[in-house]
């Protein structure tokens, strides 16, 4: 027993996968561009390099997430030319977000259509985003309804951190 009924995984800006152990569903972004996304961090670094001076000049200090123990974080706007792998994957997206039945197709070679399972997994993905305090812009990026108005941007852009 894994102790969970589902899990999500993905790359910044690219497809996000949700699985319940039987099915996998890859949700692709509504658009390839990530100009509306931001990096939220306490350690301003990409996986393989620090943020550039240009990136940091545009950073703002924003309100904490649920999991940062009241500590505000930097929001660094996404720049198109940073080479994030997720956006390259999004550019190669299939016509539809693929759904795979791991029981019949463990190698995930043949996508299937099952509207009921897809709707359930989309709902599960939404619940994970809510549970992990994802910013509203992330919901919009994946075509999901944010729990708060997008203009609030998770109440971070308009809230001044003292």
Give the location of each predicted region.
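Short, solvent-exposed polar/charged micro-motifs at secondary-structure junctions
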Residues: 1-2, 15-21, 146-151
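WW-domain-binding short linear motifs
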Residues: 3-8, 115, 120, 139, ...
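C-terminal, low-complexity/hydrophilic appendages and adjacent surface loops
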Residues: 12-113, 156-161
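Short, solvent-exposed turn/loop segments enriched in Gly/Ser/Thr/Pro and often Arg
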Residues: 12-13, 132-148
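Short amphipathic alpha-helical coiled-coil/interface segments
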Residues: 121-125
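A short, highly charged, low-complexity intrinsically disordered segment
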Residues: 143-162
């Amino acid at each position: 027993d894994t102790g969970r009924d589902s899990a999500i995984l993905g790359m910044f800006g690219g497809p996000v996968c949700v699985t319940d152990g039987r099915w996998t569903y890859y949700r692709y972004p509504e658009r390839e561009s990530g100009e509306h996304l931001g990096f939220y961090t306490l350690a301003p670094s990409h996986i393989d390099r620090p943020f550039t001076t240009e990136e940091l000049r545009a950073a703002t200090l924003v309100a904490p997430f649920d999991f940062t123990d009241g500590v505000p974080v930097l929001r660094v706007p996404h720049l198109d030319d940073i080479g994030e792998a997720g956006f390259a994957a999004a550019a190669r997206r299939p016509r539809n977000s693929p759904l795979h039945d791991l029981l019949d197709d463990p190698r995930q070679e043949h996508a299937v259509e099952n509207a009921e399972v897809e709707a359930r997994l989309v709902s599960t993905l939404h619940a994970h985003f809510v549970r992990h305090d994802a910013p509203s812009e992330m919901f919009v990026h994946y075509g999901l309804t944010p729990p708060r108005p997008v203009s609030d941007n998770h109440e971070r852009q308009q809230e001044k951190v003292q």
